[in-house]
């Protein structure tokens, strides 16, 4: 709960090299909303939420994300296409340019923090060029009580200047936009892009280094909820697999929908204070929690509005990546504070468009590590190109773009924690059944919810299982509320020989993707691989 006492504190930005700026410190959501409209940077939708257009960039730009290579990072970061090194001197020069750019401007400053567990709290100061970016920071990070602001000292600084354009030839960037992490100076420097997700994912990436390296805590790209008995469930999954949908359960309290830590004390905590949900094709019937959260204080990004300010959630004219951010207290059924104990069940969600993987299966520790490192889902190709074949997509740890360390480091931490806590790990296919995309149909959400509920309630502990002939996964033969023929995907295909061929094809994709990890993976992990 944020108190409403008047904030009288003021701050100077001179120490950051930002001279003569007009500083707007810790403005309320209402003030930031009104300033955005007054500046012509957004409009109010019929629900009272602020609607903005983020400009040229409507999503993250992973090829323009850098980490400063220095004494802290050079031997720890897994350098490559995901973690691209940046020169220390170039960083200092670029930082000074951004600071100079923000001089004489209105700058919106916010003190906030990440990590709902006080032991792991990371204080953040966010400096924004635009008021709506600062409202995003209010929504997404945890909000300190006003009395905490008097002695607030940031651990990390986020400097965010969407209007600043880098000169790639001079500044060492790839193009005019950039998001750079400096672990020695503890700065996230973001410029040339108005996409607010860069702010959120900048701090997430920082925590994905800081927590495992210094705190023996596993950072996870997952959602989490907790039952009445205090049992925590964790849902890993890439975009579009159902993380947000499936963790919103009327019988369980939401801890968070995207970023969490699993501590050495075997507790779970949310990194964030808000949610950043996709709203493409959103309906009140399918996603009531998100739909109702779109109210004053929320920010809609890149959506289409009609003359009355009503949102057309099916309109993808600007982007398919339409979003809403809101503080977590816009949702009713939440855990306060956003922490949990004793993880009992972990779900790896995948939308398998090949129609091969079972709707639910139980994993051994080796299989769990293998599938965690693989991070598989499938993308359905765009119809404009006339391509109907699904495309496999692998993202290590279900969040490769945000993981500075080698994926096997996170996988080994997860394995140790799973064994110590005796956790059940389930692979859940929210994708296709009865054939691949174009032939089969999407798994019914009703069935997926039934299977997850059965797993959470322990109803799958005493049923018979059968082993998948290629992936070696243990598939329950029965599950309450789900037709038994659905549980073995091979039985849902008219042509079972075609199924076997498709399963081998998918198995080959898995094995090919995993080659780059083989030299780092132990025997137990390699035993979790599908057969050739």
Curated annotation (Swiss-Prot):
One of its GO terms (cellular component) is cytosol. It is found in: Cytoplasm. This is Phosphoenolpyruvate carboxykinase (ATP). InterPro entries: PEP_carboxykinase_ATP, PEP_carboxykinase_C, PEP_carboxykinase_N. Pfam families: PEPCK_ATP (PF01293). Belongs to the phosphoenolpyruvate carboxykinase (ATP) family. Its cofactor is Mn(2+). CDD domains: PEPCK_ATP. GO terms for molecular function: ATP binding; metal ion binding; phosphoenolpyruvate carboxykinase (ATP) activity. Keywords: ATP-binding, Cytoplasm, Decarboxylase, Gluconeogenesis, Lyase, Manganese, Metal-binding, Nucleotide-binding. Its main location: cytoplasm. Pathway: Carbohydrate biosynthesis; gluconeogenesis. Involved in the gluconeogenesis. Catalyzes the conversion of oxaloacetate (OAA) to phosphoenolpyruvate (PEP) through direct phosphoryl transfer between the nucleoside triphosphate and OAA. Binds 1 Mn(2+) ion per subunit. ATP binds at residues 201, 221, 237-245, 287, 323, 448. It catalyses: oxaloacetate + ATP = phosphoenolpyruvate + ADP + CO2. The keyword Metal-binding applies. Its EC number is 4.1.1.49. GO terms for biological process: gluconeogenesis.
């Amino acid at each position: 709960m944020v108190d409403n006492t008047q904030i009288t504190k003021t701050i100077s930005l001179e120490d950051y090299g930002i001279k003569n700026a007009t500083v707007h410190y810790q403005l309320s959501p209402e003030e930031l909303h009104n300033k955005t409209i007054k500046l012509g940077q957004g409009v109010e939708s019929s629900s009272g939420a602020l609607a903005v257009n983020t400009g040229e960039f409507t999503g993250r730009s992973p090829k323009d994300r850098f980490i400063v290579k220095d004494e802290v990072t050079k031997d720890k970061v897994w350098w490559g296409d995901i973690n691209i090194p940046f020169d220390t001197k170039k960083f200092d020069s670029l930082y000074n340019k951004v600071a100079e750019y923000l001089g004489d401007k209105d700058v919106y400053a916010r003190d906030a923090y990440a990590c709902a567990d006080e032991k792991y709290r990371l204080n953040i100061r966010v400096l924004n060029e635009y008021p709506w970016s600062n409202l995003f920071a209010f929504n997404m990070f945890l909000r300190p009580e006003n009395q905490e602001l008097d002695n607030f000292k940031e651990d990390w600084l986020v400097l965010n200047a969407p209007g600043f354009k880098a000169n790639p030839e001079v500044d060492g960037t790839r193009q005019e936009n950039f998001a750079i992490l400096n672990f020695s100076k503890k700065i996230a420097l973001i410029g040339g892009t108005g996409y607010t997700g860069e702010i959120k994912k900048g701090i997430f990436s920082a925590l994905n280094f800081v927590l495992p390296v210094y705190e023996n805590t596993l950072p996870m790209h997952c959602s989490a909820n907790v039952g009445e008995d205090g049992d925590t469930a964790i849902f890993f999954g890439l975009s579009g697999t159902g993380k947000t949908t499936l963790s919103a359960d009327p019988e369980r309290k939401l801890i968070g929908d995207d970023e969490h830590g699993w501590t050495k004390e075997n507790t779970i905590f949310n990194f964030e204070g808000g949610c950043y949900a996709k709203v493409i094709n959103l309906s009140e019937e399918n996603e009531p929690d998100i739909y109702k959260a779109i109210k004053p204080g929320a920010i809609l990004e890149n959506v289409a509005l009609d003359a009355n300010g009503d949102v057309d959630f099916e309109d993808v004219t600007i982007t398919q990546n339409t979003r809403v951010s809101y503080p977590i207290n816009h949702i009713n059924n939440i855990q306060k504070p956003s922490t949990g104990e004793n993880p009992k069940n972990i779900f790896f969600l995948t939308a398998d468009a090949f129609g091969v993987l079972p709707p639910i299966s139980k994993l051994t520790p080796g299989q769990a590590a293998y599938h965690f490192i693989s991070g598989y889902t499938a993308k359905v190709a765009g119809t404009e190109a006339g391509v109907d074949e699904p495309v496999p997509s692998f993202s290590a740890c279900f969040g490769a773009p945000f993981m500075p360390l080698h994926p096997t480091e996170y996988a080994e931490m997860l394995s140790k924690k799973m064994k110590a806590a005796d956790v059940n790990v389930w692979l859940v296919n929210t994708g296709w059944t009865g054939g691949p995309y174009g032939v089969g149909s999407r798994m019914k959400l009703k069935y997926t919810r039934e299977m997850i509920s059965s797993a959470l309630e322990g109803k799958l502990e005493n049923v018979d299982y059968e082993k998948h002939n290629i992936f070696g996964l243990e598939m329950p033969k029965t599950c309450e509320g789900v037709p038994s023929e659905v549980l073995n995907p091979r039985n849902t295909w008219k042509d079972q020989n075609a199924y076997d061929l498709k399963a081998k094809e998918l198995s080959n994709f898995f094995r090919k993707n995993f080659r780059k990890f083989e030299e780092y993976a132990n025997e137990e992990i390699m035993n979790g691989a599908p057969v050739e």
